[in-house]
């Protein structure tokens, strides 16, 4: 994975007030951004997240370097997941 690769994240309330969806790791004291290598995997996994059902969510692509910058400024880790929600990699930006 290079900083110029596209990855996929879930966006909450796309538009002017959008933000990248974060989650709390089960059994751990760490918050993270779920990220995916494939858009379809992110769409399939969306139903597995703790979300506010009154808000709208969509999957969007982001440059990996930009995601790392966002995660670092927000104090979040990045967890790469597969479509079943299995953690493939944990990144501390």
Which ranges hold each PLM region?
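Conserved NAD+-utilizing ADP-ribose enzyme module
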Residues: 1-93
